[in-house]
Amino acid sequence: MTVLNRLHVCSLLAVSSLGMLPVGVFAAEAAMPGVDHSQMQGMDHSKMQGMDHSQMQGMDHSKMQGMDHSQMQGMDSDMTTMAPSKPAAPTQSRTPIAPVTDANRAAVYRSAKGHTVHDEAANYFLLFDQLEWQDADNGSVLNWDVNGWVGGDIDRLWIRSEGERTNGKTESAELQALWGHAISPWWDLVGGVRQDFKPGSPQTWAAFGLQGLALYNFEAEATAFLGEGGQTGLRLEGDYDILLTNRLILQPTAEVNFYGQSDPQRGIGSGLSETEVGVRLRYEIRREFAPYIGVTWNRSYGNTADFAREEGEDRSEARLVLGVRMWF
């Protein structure tokens, strides 16, 4: 019996000891011609030395004698004992899928113009930012500062009005009508007309400027004016809301006026004409209605101060103010 045959039988015995082969396999091995099991000597595994695989030569199966695999019993090539394989997944849906139509494509790929929103809806807003009584040196003063708009998110018609009445007499009054166009979410370009009713005779100005929110929600306005006779002017305004609580708000304000030339009839001097700073503390009973108390400080400069002294007025004055702020 060749060494290869002996190795084959030993492997079968080892597998049998693990219960991995049926008895029929060994019956087939016993019936295999050319293999004399009686000649096989007991294998002393203690004599087996480490196998040097590097010395193993290629096996020539053509030299193997006496092994007739056709005589092996118990091995059925059909392998009926194996579990049947799972059926292949269907390649088509039970419910046929309808072909894509133009209507389907239109529903998915909409126009790039964006969703329809209320961009062009007309709205309005009216704010009485200052409607107050002032304790002035010359008596009681009624002061107002009103602005509002009507239009959409991009284009609006702005209305501004401010003035004061002292002891029932109108000292100053003006009205502005401006068309505003949004150039960013926070800033508008404005242009239009300004009409002065007092002081002096009425005067009409062309107006254009910029308004919006600066850093930290600081509201700012810069408006330039071109009046009759070549008169020019520039007004800078700003205010800021400081929330002490959700309803108690402190509001500092500032206004500066410049003019290109003197106008004695209206008490206006060239250059820096006048400034006004103030602070108002309001309590919002409702968001739309808030009474307030505050103080303002006015000062005239240059020729404007000289014209004020000629009228018997001081160049600077502090006033206590009481008023309400409301909007619609």
UniProtKB/Swiss-Prot annotation:
GO terms for molecular function: copper ion binding. It is found in: Cell outer membrane. The gene is copB. Residues 1-27 form the signal peptide. The keyword Membrane applies. The lineage of its organism: Bacteria, Pseudomonadati, Pseudomonadota, Gammaproteobacteria, Pseudomonadales. Residues 36-75 are annotated as: 5 X 8 AA tandem repeats of D-H-S-[QK]-M-Q-G-M. Induction: By copper. It holds the Pfam family CopB. This is Copper resistance protein B. It comes from Pseudomonas syringae pv. tomato. Exact function not known. Possibly mediates copper resistance by its sequestration in the outer membrane. Sequence repeats lie at residues 36-43, 44-51, 52-59, 60-67, 68-75. The keyword Membrane applies. Residues 44-71 are annotated as: Disordered. GO terms for biological process: intracellular copper ion homeostasis. GO terms for cellular component: cell outer membrane. InterPro entries: Cu-R_B_prcur. Keywords: Cell outer membrane, Copper, Membrane, Plasmid, Repeat, Signal.
